[in-house]
């Protein structure tokens, strides 16, 4: 169970159907959906970030514990062929449905969220954190420098790299020949993915075109042992 107080915010694990329903409602609002509930919710720990002054829910995400042998049950496995990760020797967790309330963009919210994630990973002895990192919209032309940067610096190791499964993908690693403009790439890189990369994360060599969610997304993996020591210290300082 997560119970983390930092400044104006409190991170906790959902303990009731009402807590999960509140997270689903925030997700629906953030993702522009009428509702947002799926078969994966029951398998996950839901982490909620509330504002302490009035208990307003300002951020949420979910964590699904897995191992290599059951990675095919993950949300990401709908879109990526993950058989190479079936032999991964260590505990995994899929982090998903991360969102922050559109009216609350305080950077401290993200710090507390990452502190809560760190507390969960440490408590469960997780070795691999993974998920789908999304770009808003489905126009690949908007993100060519970002994708070129991913190709140049952040592709996953070949022995773990997901294969293509989804019907619509952008094979950016094979198609792009441009040298990335680093400034433009970072400006267009989604904040969540940018944080993963700062932690030593790696990505798939293709992006999935998700028409239902109106996003492009890449599979993202963070091997906990590969996180830079200074970054680990910062995260654990927040986690308390």
Tell me the role of every PLM-derived stretch:
Residues 62:
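Nucleotide-cofactor and metal-assisted catalytic machinery
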Residues 66-202, 207-215:
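Acyl-donor binding region in acyl/amide transferases
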Residues 214-227:
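C-terminal "cap" of GNAT-fold acetyltransferases
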Residues 238-240:
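Short, cationic low-complexity segments
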Residues 2-59:
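Short amphipathic alpha-helix that is part of the acyltransferase structural core
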Residues 52-54, 103-104, 224-227:
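Short loop segments at secondary-structure junctions
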Residues 226-235:
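Long, contiguous binding/interaction regions
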């Amino acid at each position: 169970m997560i119970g983390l107080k930092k400044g104006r915010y409190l991170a906790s694990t959902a303990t009731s159907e009402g807590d999960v329903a509140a997270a689903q409602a925030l997700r629906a609002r953030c993702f522009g959906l009428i509702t947002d509930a799926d078969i994966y919710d029951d398998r996950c720990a839901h982490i909620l970030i509330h504002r302490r002054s009035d208990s307003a829910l300002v951020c949420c995400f979910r964590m699904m514990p897995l191992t290599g042998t059951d990675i095919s049950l993950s949300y990401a496995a709908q879109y990526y062929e993950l058989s190479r990760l079936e032999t991964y020797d260590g505990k995994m967790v899929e982090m998903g449905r991360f969102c922050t309330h559109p009216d609350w963009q305080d950077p401290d919210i993200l710090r507390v969220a990452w502190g809560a994630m760190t507390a969960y990973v440490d408590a469960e002895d997780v070795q691999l954190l993974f998920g789908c990192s999304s770009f808003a919209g489905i126009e690949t032309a908007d993100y060519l420098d970002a994708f070129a940067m991913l190709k140049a610096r952040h592709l996953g190791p070949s022995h773990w790299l997901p294969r293509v499964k989804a019907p619509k993908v952008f094979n950016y690693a094979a198609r792009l020949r441009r040298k990335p403009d680093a400034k433009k790439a970072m400006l267009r890189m989604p904040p969540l993915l940018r944080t993963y990369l700062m932690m030593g994360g790696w990505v798939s060599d293709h992006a999935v075109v998700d028409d239902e969610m109106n996003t492009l997304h890449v599979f993202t993996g963070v091997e906990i042992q590969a996180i830079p020591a200074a970054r680990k210290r910062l995260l654990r300082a927040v986690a308390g």
